[in-house]
C-alpha cells in the first residue's frame, strides 16, 4: 500500500546570505490538511525560511532539501514553485496601479489551475462565496491591486487569493500583523476554509498566538537563531505567550530580553 508523501518536507536545511548563516539545520514535515505554526522573535530566521521555500534568489542554500509532495524544489525558479503549488502571502504586498483585482484573480487562477478553472459559473460562485466569507464587497473587484488598500484589506486580499488558487502549500508570513480582533477572526475563517479537509497544507509564520486562537495549529515550532529548538501542540503557543522565548535559548548562548505579549506588534 502506497503512502502519499508529505505536502512539505524540509531536511537539514542550512542557508544564508552573503556567507552569513541564517538557517542552521531545519527539519520540518507537514501533511495534507495540516496547519503548522512557526514562531520566534524578530531575527530568528522565520521570514528567511519562507523566502527560501519560495525560491528568493537573495538566499543561498548550502545544505539540505525542500520537497513538495516528494519532489525537491530547490532547483526550481520562484514562478515554477508557484505553478507547482507553493503560495506565499507577503508581509507587505506591493501595489500594482492599473491592474484590476478581478482580472488579477482570473489570471492567477488560470496560471495555476488552468484556463477552465478561471471562467464559467463555477468560478463566479466560488469567487462570490469566498468574498462573502471574507466580508469583501463586490466593488472590490474593480479596484487596483493593493492600491490604496488598508492593512486589513491587503490581508483579506491575500487570503482571497489563497481560497481561489487552492495551492498545495500556503506560507502565510505575519498574516495577523496590523489586524484588529475582528480582522483576525475573518482572516482565520478564510484560512480554515481553504486548508481544513483539503489536500493543501499551511505554514503560519507569526510572533504571537492571537491568530492561533482561531486557527488551531496541528503543530507549533519555535525557531531561535536559525534552529527549531522545540515543537509541540497548540498549547506551546500559549506557553510562549506567557513565558516568552528566553527559556528556550540553548544554554551557553546569549539571551536577548524579549517578552511575548498579546498586544505587542
Language model region names:
Residues 8-10, 23-25:
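Conserved structural motif at the start of ABC-family nucleotide-binding domains
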Residues 20-21, 80:
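Short coil-to-beta microelement around the adenine-binding A-loop and adjacent beta1/P-loop entry
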Residues 39-41:
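The feature captures the beta-strand-to-loop junction immediately N-terminal to the Walker
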Residues 65-81, 146:
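ABC ATPase NBD Q-loop/coupling interface
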Residues 94-168:
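ABC-family P-loop ATPase nucleotide-binding domains
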Residues 174-175, 182:
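Walker B catalytic motif
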Residues 219, 223, 227-250:
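Conserved beta-strand-loop-alpha-helix hinge in the C-terminal portion
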